[in-house]
Amino acid sequence: MEHPLFGCLRSPHATAQGLHPFSQSSLALHGRSDHMSYPELSTSSSSCIIAGYPNEEGMFASQHHRGHHHHHHHHHHHHHQQQQHQALQTNWHLPQMSSPPSAARHSLCLQPDSGGPPELGSSPPVLCSNSSSLGSSTPTGAACAPGDYGRQALSPAEAEKRSGGKRKSDSSDSQEGNYKSEVNSKPRKERTAFTKEQIRELEAEFAHHNYLTRLRRYEIAVNLDLTERQVKVWFQNRRMKWKRVKGGQQGAAAREKELVNVKKGTLLPSELSGIGAATLQQTGDSIANEDSHDSDHSSEHAHL
């Protein structure tokens, strides 16, 4: 008949059921109370080792098989039993020394179960489920942590960029508004307030010469305590006024003359229209001649 230990070696899932009869047979052979701790320790340690480290099953099963033959052939050799107990203790401590990360699984194995072999056999799936849950929770935590950290690290930079862009836009808008307000509210140049003496001297000079040379303009500016620009602007304004007055006087004289002729009856209404056109043409020609004269004088001043 095949021994249950060989069945355990062949099928790793039946380890707890195969080791339980061995514990009963060892108790039946010895009948002593001091040997009860050894099989219990061996069963619990074997179940833990097989559940956590499947590669060590053969080594532990072979040592256990040799211990079983020692119990059958040498009942009174207590020295061999002590060696077996030391070997079991070394096998029990080796997984803890070699693999610190599996402390959780060994701690779960060390808790004794009162339900018997079926509960021991059902413990590896529970461990697998816990390990799978731990394995599934670890990547999710690892996947979530970098995302949160990236958000926390990037959000201040984005906030600073957005705030900087808003500040720049606000500053540019304020600068544009200030520039527009300055342009719109730019005060006009104050008009030069000439004194009566200055106006008298300028009018006397204009009566003699409508256009000034550069040298004469400089002399007048020095004598009247004015700038050359002020003298130049005054003469320009005075010429424009004189042209308007002259044109108005000529037109008024022509109209008075026409009215006198009409009253006398020497001119017909058709002739009046022709005379009016002629007078207008004469006034236009005189204005054009004055403008050309102004341009000639300005060119002469430029050459000077």
Swiss-Prot record:
Main location (coarse class): nucleus
Localisation: Nucleus; Nucleus speckle
The keyword Calcium is annotated on this UniProt entry: no
InterPro entries: HD (IPR001356), HD_metazoa (IPR020479), Homeobox_CS (IPR017970), Homeodomain-like_sf (IPR009057), MOX-1/MOX-2 (IPR042634)
UniProt-listed Pfam families: Homeodomain (PF00046)
Domain of life, source organism: Eukaryota
Chain spans, region Disordered: 63-192
A GO molecular-function annotation: DNA-binding transcription activator activity, RNA polymerase II-specific
Listed SMART domains: HOX
Triggers of expression: Expression is repressed by ZEB2.
Biased composition (Low complexity): 112-137
Compositionally biased residues, Polar residues: 87-101
Residue spans of biased composition, Basic and acidic residues class: 158-171, 183-192
Cellular component GO terms, alphabetical: chromatin; cytoplasm; nuclear speck; nucleus
GO biological process: angiogenesis; limb development; negative regulation of cell migration involved in sprouting angiogenesis; positive regulation of transcription by RNA polymerase II; regulation of transcription by RNA polymerase II; roof of mouth development; skeletal muscle tissue development; somite development
The entry's DNA-binding region: 187-246
PROSITE patterns: HOMEOBOX_1, HOMEOBOX_2
Function as written in the Swiss-Prot or TrEMBL entry: Mesodermal transcription factor that plays a key role in somitogenesis and somitogenesis and limb muscle differentiation. Required during limb development for normal appendicular muscle formation and for the normal regulation of myogenic genes. May have a regulatory role when quiescent vascular smooth muscle cells reenter the cell cycle. Also acts as a negative regulator of angiogenesis. Activates expression of CDKN1A and CDKN2A in endothelial cells, acting as a regulator of vascular cell proliferation.
Quaternary structure (record): Interacts with RNF10. Interacts with TCF15.
Domain notes: The polyhistidine repeat may act as a targeting signal to nuclear speckles.
Record-given protein name: Homeobox protein MOX-2
Organism: Homo sapiens (Human)
Gene name of the encoded protein: MEOX2
